[in-house]
Amino acid sequence: MSFTKEQFPSLHRFSLQQYCELGEFGLLDRRTELLDGVIIDMEPVSPWHANIGDILSRIFNEGARGRFRVRVQYPINLGQMSQPQPDLVLYRPGMWRGQHPGAADISLVVQISDSSLSFDLGEKLALYRANGIQEYWVVDLKATQVHRFVAPHFKSQTFRDSISPSVWPDIRIDLRELFA
């Protein structure tokens, strides 16, 4: 069954607080994220996706040396209407009792994409840019490349050989080895 705009004129948008309350009451039975007030079901993680995430997590954790912390597939808060769950986040060290890191705390967001490339390069890119994320990577598993976007202009750069976070250039990731 499909709906036309006349039959289904608008969506109900949830605030971050309402979304968190739904989770606390056990009403979200799947992996979800909140994007601009809309609850999105997250895709299952493929073995290749998980492996790439594990490798990147190890590389970033080895390079951290107390400069940042690595968050893997956990929420971040962006304003009052969004709580995405990127694959990896590099954020400043510190304690967040009762809250997730926000844009001011984050130096890099990484999304690994095997089935959601257009969404990650469209809606998610716009969300991260609008909310002040400083650097965003989309790891394109099918094309074995990484798309990098850096504030303030967020112009697309594509990397196939190696890449480093702009604020941590000493951490070099060999993409040929990563995708091998």
Walk through the language-model features, giving the residues of each.
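Gly/Pro/Ser/Thr-rich low-complexity, intrinsically disordered segments predominantly at protein N-termini
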Residues: 1-180
